[in-house]
Amino acid sequence: MRVNVTLACTETGDRNYITTKNKRTNPDRLEMKKYSPRLKKYTLHRETK
């Protein structure tokens, strides 16, 4: 079952991206390097509730 998750920047706390993930294959929190428009660079984004 795929669910929508929000990704938040670890440095600014901005919630910049929405993506989907499969909870059965990825039960832990999702982490991705994504572009942060406020910092104008790539930063680590983590899944939020």
Swiss-Prot record:
InterPro entries according to UniProt: Ribosomal_bL33 (IPR001705), Ribosomal_bL33_CS (IPR018264), Ribosomal_bL33_sf (IPR038584), Ribosomal_zn-bd (IPR011332)
GO CC terms: cytoplasm; ribonucleoprotein complex; ribosome
Top-rank taxon, per record: Bacteria
PROSITE patterns in UniProt: RIBOSOMAL_L33
Keyword set, alphabetical order: Ribonucleoprotein, Ribosomal protein
Gene Ontology BP term (one): translation
GO MF terms, alphabetically ordered: structural constituent of ribosome
Xref: HAMAP family: Ribosomal_bL33
Family: Belongs to the bacterial ribosomal protein bL33 family.
Protein name: Large ribosomal subunit protein bL33B
Organism, as annotated: Bacillus velezensis (strain DSM 23117 / BGSC 10A6 / LMG 26770 / FZB42)
